[in-house]
């Protein structure tokens, strides 16, 4: 069993881009930024508990931080983890709040 405190820390924010909005409409998939050390089981459990939806599948990947240049220094941004969460048909997990 996962503690309530850990559940609330696993899901960081929705990842909104052109690609994610298309996948949300076509494939009923939501993309979230999650903790680097979160497992698929923890992510699935957190989504079920917090949003009360049925999860069909989860795919995760780690995104490497970009190197940015500031004057004469090179700074690397933090690495982060992204989760593609496919929600079962009939369930809706909409962060943007489209009213149609």
Curated annotation (Swiss-Prot):
Ranges in coiled-coil conformation: none
Q: Which UniProt keywords apply?
A: Ribonucleoprotein, Ribosomal protein, RNA-binding, rRNA-binding
GO terms (molecular function) for this protein are: rRNA binding; structural constituent of ribosome
Instruction: Please give the SUPFAM superfamilies that the UniProt record associates with this protein.
Output: Ribosomal proteins S24e, L23 and L15e
GO BP terms: translation
Q: Report which superkingdom the organism of origin falls in.
A: Bacteria
Q: Which InterPro entries match?
A: Nucleotide-bd_a/b_plait_sf, Ribosomal_uL23-like, Ribosomal_uL23/eL15/eS24_sf
Q: Does the keyword Ribonucleoprotein apply?
A: yes
Give me the Gene Ontology terms describing cellular component: ribonucleoprotein complex; ribosome
Q: Note the subunit structure.
A: Part of the 50S ribosomal subunit. Contacts protein L29, and trigger factor when it is bound to the ribosome.
- Function recorded in the entry: One of the early assembly proteins it binds 23S rRNA. One of the proteins that surrounds the polypeptide exit tunnel on the outside of the ribosome. Forms the main docking site for trigger factor binding to the ribosome.
- What family does this chain come from, according to its entry? Belongs to the universal ribosomal protein uL23 family.
What is this protein's record name? Answer: Large ribosomal subunit protein uL23
Q: Which organism is it from?
A: Buchnera aphidicola subsp. Acyrthosiphon pisum (strain APS) (Acyrthosiphon pisum symbiotic bacterium)
